[in-house]
């Protein structure tokens, strides 16, 4: 199964809630049987520069899908995703700080911030 962009928000139907999407995903995984339940979240950020150039950053986190939802924090598929880089908690069980430290969005934003910092040498000299 592959979810892309806004389609993941409507996976269980046009009016589905986050919980509906998680339940639907788990039911689909049960239907296809046992096997690896690996998953990954990815985010790309592009910054258009005044000179026509672009900066492109990507963040990714790999993990597994749980058998049942766990936790009440976060949003979307957070209750069913356990990142490989974590402590065995789902994203929904983590504090926001712990999640953002390893999330795909956090990684992409940190990578973009580094690229912007390197692309703007005048900003470094004003500190």
Residue ranges and their predicted role:
Residues 1-127:
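Anionic-ligand binding patches
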């Amino acid at each position: 199964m592959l979810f892309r962009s806004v389609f993941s928000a409507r996976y269980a139907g046009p009016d589905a809630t986050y919980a509906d999407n998680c339940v639907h995903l788990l039911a689909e995984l049960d239907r296809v049987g046992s096997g690896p339940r690996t998953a990954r979240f990815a985010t790309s950020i592009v910054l258009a520069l005044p000179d026509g150039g672009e900066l492109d950053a990507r963040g990714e986190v790999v993990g597994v899908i749980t058998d049942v939802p766990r936790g009440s924090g976060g949003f979307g598929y957070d209750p069913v995703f356990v990142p490989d880089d974590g402590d065995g908690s789902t994203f929904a069980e983590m504090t926001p700080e712990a999640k953002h430290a390893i999330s795909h969005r956090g990684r992409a934003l940190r990578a973009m911030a580094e690229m912007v910092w390197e692309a703007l040498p005048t900003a470094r000299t004003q500190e």
